[in-house]
Structures are given as structure tokens and as C-alpha cells.
């Protein structure tokens, strides 16, 4: 059974108003969306996903809860354009559950999982051209090294890149997994899950995940009402660092000389999963929920 990560903490801290407007930017299987929608009466939930299958698979479930939901098949980096098309200029809350969703991992043919053999793909939006096969088989040494260093945080990125280029063509996930393991030092393999990091790096590149996150963070503030929240769940240090620094910059820019926290325009809270949640849902182990509240 799919369990949404940090669901109780997210719902508790969103302070959901029954007549509010909320935006779920990463629908996935719809667990967070369903919890929000069930608390709305006259309010509205707008859900985004760049993966059309996510919308198809969640639509019936959400509409059974309430008809007050709008489905948008689009990259969340374009949220502002889509909201304004619908004459929505202020919302009560945004939520994001970043990274790859459980269905994308579970569907082996999508090529996201290094434990399932499939053609190298990793596209969240199946209509886009760039896929993992192109990255692995066509990027030059400098570009591929940069991807592995920046998005996989791999110290052996250059030697891995050379091994990949020397072994082309590489067509499947298992071919790539075997190559990574055979070309990495044993000591490094024992210390770090290099395969996981390589797959993460390629996935981030294919879907421009960090670029989309930065695009959202550059725009969302002007869409927040008074007493509203943005809640973002991250799963690795790269995306978490971006969110943390943005929230920190907002805190600094709105800082007052008063000691009363209610005088601050913004406040921030960070929540990690409990031991019991991690035991129930292993995916939550690396999760971190950051919540920014706009107080006025």
C-alpha cells in the first residue's frame, strides 16, 4: 500500500481552510491531494503533474472525494502561467513532494529503478525528447562528468564517465548498473551507493528537476495570501539545500528588530519523519519537510 510521506505533519501545518485555494504541484499517487481535498467544502484544490499517467491514475479517486479539483498536466515550473489562465492570483498554500514518485519506481519499464531491467528512459513527461538513453550515450566527457559531479555528488565522476563512454552503446538499466559496479573502486562501493547516485544524477538531468524547483522558488511568494503556507518535502541534499537557502533568504530579508516572532513576515519550520513512520514507510527515511508561513 502506498503511504504518502510525512502526511500528518504536512496536513497539520498547512492550517487548511475549508474555503481556501490550495495547489499540489506534484500530484503523484494523490495521497497528499486526497487529504487536502477531504478538508475543503467550498475551497479549491489545483493539482499539477508533468507525468500524464499520474493524473490519469489519481483522477477518479480525487473526484470521488470532491468535484472542487482542477487537474493540470504541466511541469510545475509553469504554475504561474497556469494559475493566471484561470484568473487565480493568490492561494492559501502550495505543497510539493519532490523527486521520483512511487509509481514511477514501481513501473520498471519507465527506467527509473536500478533494481528493474528496462531501456534507459527516466522521463517523467513521456512526451519530452530528452531521456536517459540520450544522456548516457551522447553527452560528451565534460558534460557527463558535470552531471555526475553536480547531481550525483560523485568523487569518481570523471573515471565513471570515461568508462561509460568507452562502453557505449549502453541501452538498459542493468547494463549501466553492471558498468558502474565494475568500474568503481571496491572501497567506494562499500562506503556509498554509487549506483543510486548515478541514477539520481541522470534523472535530475533528464527532468531538469533542480531548474524547475528554482523556477518555482523565484515566483511563489507573490501568490501567497496572508496566513498562508508553502510545504516542500525533499529527499536529498541538493534539492533540500536550494529550499533551505531560499527560505533563509526570505527570513533575513524580512527580519525586524522586534523579538516577537509574530512581527516577522515569514516563519520557517523543519520536520523530519518519526522513527515509527520510517518503520512503516522506508521511503520516508531521507525525507525532510520544510514549511514557510507568510504571516502577513
From Swiss-Prot:
Question: Has keyword Ribonucleoprotein?
Answer: no
GO terms for cellular component: cytoplasm
Catalytic reactions on record: cytidine(1402) in 16S rRNA + S-adenosyl-L-methionine = N(4)-methylcytidine(1402) in 16S rRNA + S-adenosyl-L-homocysteine + H(+)
The record, for InterPro entries, names: RsmH, SAM-dep_MeTrfase_MraW_recog, SAM-dependent_MTases_sf
Q: Does the keyword Methyltransferase apply?
A: yes
| Gene Ontology biological process terms from the UniProt entry | rRNA base methylation
Q: Which domain of life is it from?
A: Bacteria
Q: What is its EC number?
A: 2.1.1.199
Quick one: which residues bind S-adenosyl-L-methionine?
30-32, 49, 97, 104
Sequence intervals crossing the membrane: none
Localization recorded for this chain is:
Cytoplasm
Q: Which UniProt keywords apply?
A: Cytoplasm, Methyltransferase, rRNA processing, S-adenosyl-L-methionine, Transferase
MF terms from GO for this chain are: rRNA (cytosine-N4-)-methyltransferase activity
Per the entry, what this protein does is:
Specifically methylates the N4 position of cytidine in position 1402 (C1402) of 16S rRNA.
Cross-referenced PANTHER family: 12S RRNA N4-METHYLCYTIDINE METHYLTRANSFERASE, S-ADENOSYL-METHYLTRANSFERASE MRAW
Q: Which family does it belong to?
A: Belongs to the methyltransferase superfamily. RsmH family.
Q: Per its record, how is this protein called by name?
A: Ribosomal RNA small subunit methyltransferase H
Source organism of the structure: Mesomycoplasma conjunctivae (strain ATCC 25834 / NCTC 10147 / HRC/581) (Mycoplasma conjunctivae)
Amino acid at each position: 500500500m502506498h503511504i504518502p510521506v510525512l502526511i500528518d505533519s504536512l496536513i497539520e501545518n498547512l492550517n487548511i481552510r475549508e474555503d481556501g485555494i490550495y495547489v499540489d504541484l506534484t500530484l503523484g499517487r494523490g495521497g497528499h491531494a486526497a487529504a487536502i481535498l477531504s478538508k475543503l467544502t467550498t475551497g479549491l484544490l489545483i493539482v499539477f503533474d508533468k507525468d500524464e499517467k499520474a493524473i490519469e491514475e489519481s483522477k477518479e479517486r480525487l473526484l470521488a472525494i470532491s468535484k472542487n479539483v482542477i487537474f493540470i498536466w504541466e511541469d510545475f515550473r509553469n504554475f504561474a502561467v497556469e494559475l493566471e489562465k484561470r484568473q487565480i492570483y493568490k492561494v492559501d498554500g502550495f505543497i510539493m513532494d519532490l523527486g521520483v514518485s512511487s509509481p514511477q519506481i514501481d513501473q520498471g519499464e519507465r527506467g527509473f529503478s536500478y533494481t528493474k531491467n528496462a531501456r534507459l528512459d527516466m522521463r517523467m513527461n513521456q512526451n519530452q525528447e530528452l531521456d536517459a538513453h540520450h544522456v548516457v550515450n551522447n553527452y560528451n566527457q565534460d558534460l557527463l562528468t558535470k552531471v555526475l559531479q553536480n547531481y550525483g555528488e560523485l568523487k569518481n565522476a570523471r573515471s565513471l564517465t570515461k568508462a561509460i563512454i568507452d562502453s557505449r552503446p549502453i541501452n538498459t538499466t542493468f547494463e549501466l548498473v553492471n558498468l558502474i559496479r565494475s568500474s568503481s573502486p571496491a572501497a567506494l562501493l562499500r562506503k556509498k551507493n554509487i549506483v543510486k547516485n548515478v541514477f539520481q544524477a541522470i534523472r535530475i538531468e533528464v527532468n531538469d528537476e533542480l531548474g524547475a524547483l528554482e523556477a518555482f522558488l523565484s515566483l511563489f511568494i507573490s501568490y501567497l495570501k496572508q496566513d498562508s503556507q508553502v510545504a516542500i518535502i525533499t529527499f536529498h541534499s541538493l534539492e533540500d539545500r536550494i529550499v533551505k537557502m531560499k527560505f533563509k533568504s526570505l527570513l533575513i530579508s524580512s527580519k525586524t528588530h522586534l523579538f516577537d516572532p509574530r512581527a516577522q513576515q515569514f516563519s520557517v519550520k523543519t520536520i523530519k519523519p518519526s522513527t515509527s513512520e520510517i518503520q512503516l514507510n522506508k521511503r520516508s527515511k531521507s525525507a525532510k519537510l520544510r514549511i514557510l508561513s507568510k504571516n502577513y
